[in-house]
Every structure is written in C-alpha cells, then in structure tokens.
Amino acid sequence: METKTLETLKQELDNLFHKFFEDMKIDEKTGIVKDTNKRFSGYPYIGEKYVEAPVKILFIPLDTGSDELYKDNTYHKFDGRIKQITPKKDAKHVFNPHIAGLYATTVCLLKEKLDSAKECWEYLDKAGGKTTSTKINNSWKKLNEEQKNLLSYVAYDNRYKFVTIGRNYKSGGKDRTWLNKDKERELLLSEIEIFNPDIIVFQGKTGLDNCNVKNKEKYTIFKANHPSHYGSGANKLDYIEKIFDKKEGFPKK
C-alpha cells in the first residue's frame, strides 16, 4: 500500500470533518452546534513527521482537558493544534501534565526505534523529580532539537468531540458526553482508519470500552489511565513502561 503524504492525510480528515459538520449542523467558522450550548472541540494533532515515523502512534484521550479558544468561541484546526502543543520558550513548565505524559510515552515507544529517543529516555530516567512533568523540566536544557520535537512523530485525537460553550476551566469531565453517540463514534472509527496507525494508545478508563475498533487485528492497542492522574501513579515515568506490558489492560500502580 502506498504511504500517504501528510497533506493527503490532512485532506482526507478535513473531508471527513466537513461531512460530520453537515450531519451535526455545526457552524464551520465557530464550531457551534445549532440549537445547543456545545461547540466542536477541535481537529486532531498531527505531528509533521507522523507519516514517516518508524512506528505510527495514535493517542486517543477522552476529551479536551482545556478549551483553549473559549474566549474566541471557535476551535483549532491542524495548524492551531500544532502551535498549542509546541512548548513556549519562556514558559515556566515545558508541557502541561497531560502533554508531558504524552511526550514521555512517545519517547518510551520510540526508544527502540530512534537513537534520539533512546538517549532522551535515559536523560528522563536519570533526571531529578518524581513526576514526569518535573523530569522533563529538569532534562529539557540537555536535549537537542530532535529530542525536543519527538512529538512530531505522533498524532493524537479525542474520543469526545464537543465542549460546553464558554467553559473556562481545565477539567474535562463535564464534557464527557455524547450529542449523537452513533455519529460521533463512527467519526472516531473513520479517523482511526484514515490515520492507519501501528499503535493506538487509549487514555482514560472508558477510552476503549465499547469503541469497537474496526479491524482491531491491524493495530497494537494499549490503554492506560490519563497521564496526569496522580491517584493511579500515571504521572510517573515508571508507570509508562508498565503500560506496554499488558495490551488492552490497565497497569497496576
């Protein structure tokens, strides 16, 4: 099968979203769903090296934890999502706890495929601090540009596609609901087929339940707690390696 270019991948997803917007009566400009208090939460993140990655990894957390564009009452497309994930040079913390977990999980999955990821994992493992976020902050100045940009090899999406209009807090639990369960699930399944990943990592306790991934045998599927979940220890580096000891099952703390 011919490998898709990044632009082809984006175009196929864009076409899929246009159809979804029509079916759900979503305003293309704002993302607001007609006659509701809900707005489309945004396009998925696609790293610029995803299609050429030695192993294609797709992360699927439950929902967007922070509605970045609530003040503008609109949503991120592909470029906006990239900018949102890219670390700010003057930021006190490199990543928020969720993206820190995403980054460290990416490094773990790629460390047998890329020398840059292997060395990066060693830096993180030796760094001071208990949480993944702290270890990344303490290692960041030692990393080269390739290591800092390892998220460019992966993609991530959300299972739940809508946020409440005007929501200005980070907790995403309120928006783990469906407007049209069948259409939203079909959208996610179609996205997975277009992404055609080698590995899918579902994040959150209900991330994989009842998802009915088509042609599951094509993928290696893992699931884990949300990477910022303190109660499960998911915010620690040693939790990440445990994820991959057990497919489709949660690692123990």
What does each model-found stretch correspond to?
Residues 1-15, 28, 170-190, 199, ...:
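C-terminal capping/extension of enzyme domains
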Residues 2-195, 199:
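A polyanion-binding, active-site-adjacent surface
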